Amino acid sequence: MALALDTLRLADYLTGVLGEPVEVVGLRSLGGEAIEDPKGFGYGVPFEVECRLASGPRSLVVSRTRPASGFGHDYPADRAWQALYGHAAYNDFPRHARSLDVGFVRTDGEMVSAADAVDFFQLVEKVEGRLYWLDLQRLMQASPTPLDTERARALAGFLATVHADKRDEPALYARRVRELVGHGECVMGILDSLPHPWPPLRPELCEALETAFVRWRWRLRERAGRLSRTHGDFHPWNILFREGTDFGVLDRSRGEWGEPADDVAALGINYLFFGMRRAAARGERGVAEPFLTLFHTFLATYVERSHDRELFDTLPPFLAFRALVLAHPRWYPDLAPTVRDGLIHLATRLAASARFEPGDVAWLCGAVR
């Protein structure tokens, strides 16, 4: 939502910040001078505010981040970060213009200070249910029931419905693919956070992985028509089942729009993960049942419901990223070496591939061909 500056609201806000009555006598956009400026675009949208106070006249600037597409400022949360960062960073640098406050605008136009905030929280409803990973953990020992298959199908159908909501914004799709590679929570962040030197993924192997992911970034940019509504972290620790196939979800993240393969990979990799753990417990490699069948059921149902025949062309880097997360010793410190090796094998093979072939999944996860 654009920042609308109402002079009365602004005066009330400034009175609270400055500690004395403020009258706003002038308000104008900066950067609108007739002088020809070689800089044709900037991230900021600054307004000069001329004020009259008992202590004397004062000039201030109210600035916001422009919601321009393509520069990582697409969502209000992106722009909030810029303001919060600026308030702290400006005042810790010599000769810099001082930041007096950082605030936000309510839906009714009221301007509210947030300068004394030291941390942020979110208040959400409690979702009743049992986390889906507990279903998968049960299957490490028990035989599957028809409900296990029904739940895999229900999750696939849900994603197909969610992903049917499309958006035409190539720059936003490019951003999501870029974040897959370079975001602190994604490939480069995961690789940077390994306890180097770490024998399973030596620095030269990490470099090769990053190079392969960058190639995927440029390959996927041409598929911007796939931009869809997504969850962003659709894994079994964020899904709670109630009775039957009724479920709720938690912790949507990494943007509201993205590549459908991201959600498919986030859940699909966990069928493989639990299957690899079960195989390792038996002294085997690959993906044990019933997890291999659940993986194929989930994937086939998604393709059937979504009619997404391009999925297998976009799935490899997202599955590879999720495999790297699962292989990380910080997140999963107690994995059997064969499972960790299998996940790294999966990630490296998929990152270097051109397409995901479902029939190869057991081999990709370490089974002997």
Where are these regions (language model features)?
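Active-site acidic catalytic loop and adjacent metal/ATP-binding pocket
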Residues: 36-57, 61-62, 162, 214-264
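A glycine-centered beta->alpha junction motif in the catalytic cores
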Residues: 66-68, 121, 125-144, 164-167, ...
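Active-site activation/catalytic loop segments of kinase-like enzymes and analogous catalytic loops
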Residues: 261-306, 320-338
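Charge-rich, low-complexity intrinsically disordered segments
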Residues: 341-369
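Active-site catalytic-loop/activation-segment of kinase and kinase-like phosphoryl-transfer enzymes
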Residues: 1, 120, 125-127, 172-219, ...
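Conserved ATP-binding subdomain of kinase catalytic cores across diverse folds
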Residues: 34-35, 44-45, 50-182
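All-alpha amphipathic helical-bundle segments outside canonical DNA-binding/catalytic cores
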Residues: 150, 175, 307-319
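Juxta-kinase regulatory segment immediately upstream of eukaryotic protein kinase catalytic domains
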Residues: 1-35
